């Protein structure tokens, strides 16, 4: 197997295996295989640390280190650096929770009922919730008028959300980026929209405790919808800029947490109507083979595909394509950014055409329309 490039370094098969072993240990509290770490050098450990940063799972990987025998752990110098970064992740998670609860309280005090997508809504499912590296706050209002009302209340506080080309709205709350999404998911296939709306009515959002030291409640998608939304989210990033281990870990943790709460037949039928069955075989194969998710935790029983194609994509470009040279290049011109997005999708279209051809086609069509509109503008 070929080595994968990480910045200017090479992530070897040994380092990839070590990182996945540590992730599995943190997720399922299982002892890592000692033989994987017996020949690790200081340089190998540096590679694992760098890769865990780029995949935004460094705190979880550090947690996995605590289950290693002391004689197999990295040097004290590296361990101290890693623990310091873990502490920073925990601090940022606390800050995120404070900002989220403050925003939810503000919106609910004004009679609004936002739904928390991804983020802290998934972090609460983790064995160690504060170790999930947070990004921004994603909200959705099932009633469109409530989003408009939210913007009015925000404007009264001097906050003016910026409209994005994809229809979402972006602003900052207590220093944390917030995004209001017009839809539960960005599924591009127009013929699947009726199915999504039907599922949203059939499996309404639920009120759950946020946890993590607070008694607060938040609204999140139902278990059924949550897994479907994550499936689509991962697909879009896999055929676009890139997908990282954090999103895959989110999915694995969700599958394990929701075991017994999802009707297998209904989930498979919904996946079929959304044309996701072939993609699910690849995605579920990765979860079982690379993250050691017990197969009985999958939403339904199926014949799995090998997850190697997806794993290759993950190692190459990392979380949201942050390792990609295309993503790292800067430009002040929006059309150049659109060209890089189009080129990224074109270069990874083989994965999409093979496992989700309809969604890949309509995503490419939507991107092309967006570029034409920007040129006319």
Q: Model-found features: residue ranges?
A:
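Conserved NTP-donor binding/palm subdomain of two-metal-ion nucleotidyltransferases/polymerases, i.e.
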Residues: 2-135, 141-377
């Amino acid at each position: 197997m070929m080595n994968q490039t990480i910045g200017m370094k090479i992530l070897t098969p040994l380092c990839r295996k070590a990182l996945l072993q540590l992730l599995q240990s943190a997720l399922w509290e299982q002892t890592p295989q000692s033989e994987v770490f017996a020949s690790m050098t200081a340089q190998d450990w540096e590679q694992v640390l760098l890769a865990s940063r780029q995949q935004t799972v460094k705190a979880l990987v550090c947690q996995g280190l605590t289950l290693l025998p002391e004689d197999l752990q990295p040097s004290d110098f590296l361990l101290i650096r890693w623990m310091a970064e873990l502490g920073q992740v925990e601090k940022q998670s606390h800050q995120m929770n404070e900002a989220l609860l403050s925003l939810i309280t503000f919106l609910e005090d004004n009679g609004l009922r936002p739904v928390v997508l991804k983020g802290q809504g998934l972090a609460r499912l983790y064995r160690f919730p504060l170790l999930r590296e947070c990004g921004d706050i994603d909200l959705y209002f099932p009633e469109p008028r409530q989003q408009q009302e939210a913007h009015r209340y925000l404007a009264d506080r001097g906050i003016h959300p910026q409209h994005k080309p994809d229809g979402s709205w972006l602003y900052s709350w207590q220093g944390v980026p917030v995004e209001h999404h017009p839809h539960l998911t960005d599924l591009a296939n127009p013929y699947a929209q009726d199915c999504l709306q039907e599922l949203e009515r059939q499996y309404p959002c639920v009120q759950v405790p946020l946890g993590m030291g607070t008694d607060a409640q938040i609204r999140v998608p139902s278990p059924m919808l949550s897994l479907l939304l994550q499936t689509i989210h991962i697909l879009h990033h896999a055929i676009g800029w890139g997908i990282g281990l954090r999103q895959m870990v989110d999915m694995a943790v969700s599958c394990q947490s929701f075991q017994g709460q999802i009707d297998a037949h209904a989930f498979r039928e919904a996946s079929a109507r959304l044309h996701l069955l072939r993609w699910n075989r690849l995605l579920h194969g990765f979860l079982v083979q690379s993250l050691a998710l017990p197969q009985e935790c999958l939403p339904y029983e199926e014949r799995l595909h090998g997850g190697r194609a997806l794993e290759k994509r993950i190692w190459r470009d990392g979380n949201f394509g942050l390792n990609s040279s295309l993503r790292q290049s800067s430009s002040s011109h929006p059309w150049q950014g659109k060209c890089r997005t189009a080129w990224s999708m074109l270069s990874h279209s083989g994965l999409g055409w093979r496992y989700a051809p309809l969604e890949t086609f309509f995503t490419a069509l939507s991107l092309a329309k967006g570029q034409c509109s920007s040129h006319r503008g």
